[in-house]
Amino acid sequence: MKISEKEVQHVAHLSRLHLDQDELASMTEQLDGILSYMEKLAEVDTEGVLPTTHAFSKTNAFREDIVKDSLSQEESLANGPVQNGTAFQVPRVI
């Protein structure tokens, strides 16, 4: 599939991208290469190949949840410069 500069310019406009003439030519060439490769992939016979979501078997390594002692609330709050009761006080961002 050949893509034209006009089509690339249209997509750039929809994406709110400004492309100068050099960028437009480069992008057209790159997209044309990508679409040509996609056409080659479409020609591959995948009949009888099971669909997969991962190239390898994905397994989760679960561990048992074990409750451990950690810092108390007072010890945790001691690490912050300003506390407000039971929480850190930070400057307003918005």
Curated annotation (Swiss-Prot):
The protein, known as: Aspartyl/glutamyl-tRNA(Asn/Gln) amidotransferase subunit C
GO MF, any single term: glutaminyl-tRNA synthase (glutamine-hydrolyzing) activity
HAMAP family with a match to the protein in the record: GatC
Keywords: ATP-binding, Ligase, Nucleotide-binding, Protein biosynthesis
GO annotation terms (biological process): glutaminyl-tRNAGln biosynthesis via transamidation; regulation of translational fidelity; translation
Protein family per UniProt: Belongs to the GatC family.
Subunit structure: Heterotrimer of A, B and C subunits.
Function: Allows the formation of correctly charged Asn-tRNA(Asn) or Gln-tRNA(Gln) through the transamidation of misacylated Asp-tRNA(Asn) or Glu-tRNA(Gln) in organisms which lack either or both of asparaginyl-tRNA or glutaminyl-tRNA synthetases. The reaction takes place in the presence of glutamine and ATP through an activated phospho-Asp-tRNA(Asn) or phospho-Glu-tRNA(Gln).
Pfam families recorded: GatC
First-tier enzyme category under EC: ligase
EC number annotated for this UniProt entry: 6.3.5.-
Catalytic activity annotation: L-glutamyl-tRNA(Gln) + L-glutamine + ATP + H2O = L-glutaminyl-tRNA(Gln) + L-glutamate + ADP + phosphate + H(+); L-aspartyl-tRNA(Asn) + L-glutamine + ATP + H2O = L-asparaginyl-tRNA(Asn) + L-glutamate + ADP + phosphate + 2 H(+)
Species whose genome carries this gene: Desulfotalea psychrophila (strain LSv54 / DSM 12343)
